[in-house]
Amino acid sequence: MNVVDARLEAQMQENHDDAGQLFDPTAAHPDSVAVCRFIEHRLAFAREPVCRTDLSGGVLYRECLARLARGQRDVLRPVAFLPGLVSMGLMRWFDQLVVSRTIDSLRADAQAVYGCNVSASSATEDAQWQAIFDRLHVEPALAQRLVLEITETTPLDPLSGRAFVHRARQTGCRIAIDDFGAGHSAHNHFVVGRPDIVKLDRSMLAMIRNNAVGRYQVRRLVALTHENAGHVVVEGVETELDRQMSIDAGVRWAQGDHFSRRSDAA
């Protein structure tokens, strides 16, 4: 362990009960080099399956959810470190690292199909993205097993964002619009054109629960989305009731704790 890693490790131990201090977005002089080193050593994935709502079997893919290992059993979730990365201007670097590590995982398992997030602000091609796309271009069978999920945190740039998506598709990757129905996802859907996958935000389930008008609106949205996307997924399915409501709304694929528990039990 070098000096930088040792210092950051010591800081992590000191702030064990308040990990937010390590990636504090309000810090006056954040040590971005040390933070990058730490993330490179601690990045791990929780893989959440996208399953058929009717339980007929099959997994569309597994989303690689970023975690930072902290000790033997504890992990940091994105809410604890992403704001700090954004404030330090490291979001694109982090997304590129996540995609690269996901590609490594696909190479290690020839049967796996994985997805990972790319924030809309990161979806602008640069030298590092070019290197990643070149890597995928020479392994088209691997690229076909990768889903890039465009998140809704910011609007996707109409020019550079569309060029990024086009370049990714040229390699064979599939494109998903994440959290559709929230934030800037509708705009990002327009920029992407016809996405391979649209993932409905978990708020859609709340609309279904609330009243008949909400149920009608979600069914209509699902029907329209099916016309412009290969697959529609609803996120945040946590209970059997959520699964049944998803089926009633016409959604064939779902993701959430309800399916993760079933997958773990299997």
Write out the residue ranges for each language-model feature.
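EAL-family c-di-GMP phosphodiesterase catalytic domain
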Residues: 1-29, 33, 38, 42-48, ...
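A short, well-structured catalytic beta-strand-centered motif of the EAL phosphodiesterase domain
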Residues: 44-82
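Catalytic core of bacterial c-di-GMP phosphodiesterases, primarily the EAL and HD-GYP domains
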Residues: 90-160, 236
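Charged helix-capping and loop-helix junction motifs
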Residues: 130-134, 162-163, 212-219
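N-terminal sensory regulatory modules of PAS/LOV and PAS-like folds
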Residues: 78-81, 98, 259
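Structural preference for long, well-ordered alpha-helical segments in enzyme cores
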Residues: 85, 98-102, 132, 221, ...
